From Swiss-Prot:
It is a peripheral membrane protein. One of its GO terms (cellular component) is plasma membrane-derived thylakoid membrane. This is ATP synthase subunit delta. It holds the Pfam family OSCP. The gene is atpH.
Length: 182
C-alpha cells in the first residue's frame, strides 16, 4: 500500500462507516465529488487550506463558513478533523480514496472518457454501450473530459485497460511503426 494510502485510508474508511450508519452514503459521495471538483479547480482554496501560515482555527472557521450549509454535519466534522490533525492539505487524497472504497464496495467501475471535443448525448450513449462491454459491467461511473490535444477521437480508461482511438494516438503509433521500419 503506498504511503499516501496508509494515511488517507483510515480517514476514508471511518468516514464511510459514519455515513453508512447515518444513511448518508449517497449524499456524502455527491458532496465529496463537489468538494473534490472545487479543490482541483480552485488553487487558491487548496493552497490556503494547505498553507502552514494559516492557523488551524482560521482554517476551521473558513471550512465552517464555506460548507456548513452545503454538506452533512458528519462531512463538516471530517473537514474539521483533518484541519485539527494538520491533514487538510490531503483532503483531495482522502476524498479520492473515499470514492475508490465506495466504488469497490458497490462493484462500480470508473471509466474516464477523454475526447477531443464535447460529446453530444447520442455519442455519449453509443460510447457508454461500448465501454460497458469493455468493462464487462453495466455498473459504471463515467468521467467525461475534453482534451483538444487529442486532435480528434477519444481515449477510454477503464481500470487498467486503455483504448486509444484518438488521432494523436494514431499519429504516435504510426511514428513508432515508421521508426521500426527504418
Amino acid at each position: 500500500m503506498p504511503l499516501l494510502n496508509t494515511i488517507t485510508t483510515p480517514y476514508a474508511e471511518a468516514f464511510l462507516q459514519v455515513a453508512e450508519s447515518r444513511n448518508e452514503v449517497d449524499e456524502v459521495v455527491t458532496q465529496a465529488k463537489s468538494i473534490l471538483e472545487l479543490w482541483n479547480s480552485c488553487p487558491e482554496f487548496s493552497d490556503a487550506m494547505s498553507s502552514p501560515v494559516l492557523e488551524v482555527n482560521q482554517k476551521k472557521a473558513a471550512l465552517e463558513k464555506l460548507f456548513s450549509s452545503q454538506v452533512t454535519p458528519s462531512f463538516l466534522n471530517l473537514l474539521k478533523l483533518l484541519a485539527d490533525r494538520q491533514r487538510i492539505g490531503l483532503l483531495n487524497s482522502v476524498l479520492e480514496r473515499l470514492l475508490e472504497i465506495y466504488r469497490e464496495q458497490r462493484n462500480i467501475a470508473l471509466a474516464t472518457i477523454t475526447s477531443a471535443s464535447a460529446l453530444n448525448e447520442d455519442q455519449q450513449s453509443e460510447l457508454l454501450k461500448k465501454v460497458q462491454s469493455i468493462a464487462g459491467t453495466d455498473n459504471l461511473e463515467i468521467d467525461l473530459k475534453v482534451d483538444s490535444e487529442l486532435l480528434g477521437g477519444f481515449v477510454v480508461n477503464v481500470g487498467s485497460k486503455v483504448i486509444d482511438a484518438s488521432i494523436a494516438g494514431q499519429v504516435r503509433r504510426l511514428g513508432l511503426a515508421l521508426a521500426k521500419v527504418s
